[in-house]
Amino acid sequence: SKKMIGVDTIEHIETLCAGGNLDNIDLKIKDMSRDGNFQISRDLTAANFGKLSDMATNEDIALGIANMVGETIAMLAVFAARSYNIKTVVLTGNLTAIKAINNVFDDLEAHFGVRFVIPELSQFATVIGAALADIEK
């Protein structure tokens, strides 16, 4: 994100995301056809950054990055969960602390039949796991 929008802290990224508009960045299914005869939601992303133009603001780009990261994580999780017939995925790590990414998980739950759970203080799960692994040694 630093090369694209000049910021690299979660706080700054979240601030930018709050003012962004994905309609200025992502190409949606609804942008490609007017008839609406689709088996999937017209609001799903067809191409991340598919509508990027010189008019996009840093806020739009920040939200586009967060959305792309969230959608990538969500879809990989959906495909992995489906291959094992799992309906619930628990997400942990620093990215779960970014509201714009969490919103992606909320939006995609209904579309793909997988429930995403983000525990409280989930950004610390990796550290806790490492500490517990060290104790077991």
Tell where the protein language model's regions lie, with residue ranges:
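Glycine-rich phosphate-binding loops at beta-strand->alpha-helix junctions
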Residues: 78-108, 122-123
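Glycine-rich phosphate-binding loop plus the immediately following alpha-helix
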Residues: 1-25
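Acidic-glycine-rich active-site phosphate/pyrophosphate-binding loop
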Residues: 43-53, 99-112
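C-terminal region/appendage detector
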Residues: 15-18, 72, 117, 122-124
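Glycine-rich phosphate-binding/hydrolytic loop that grips phosphoryl groups
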Residues: 1-5, 116-137
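Adenine-nucleotide phosphate-binding core of ATP-dependent small-molecule kinases
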Residues: 38-88, 123
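Carbohydrate-associated surface elements
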Residues: 17, 27-30, 38-43
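Glycine/charged-rich beta-loop-alpha catalytic/anionic-binding loops adjacent to active sites
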Residues: 56-60, 109-117
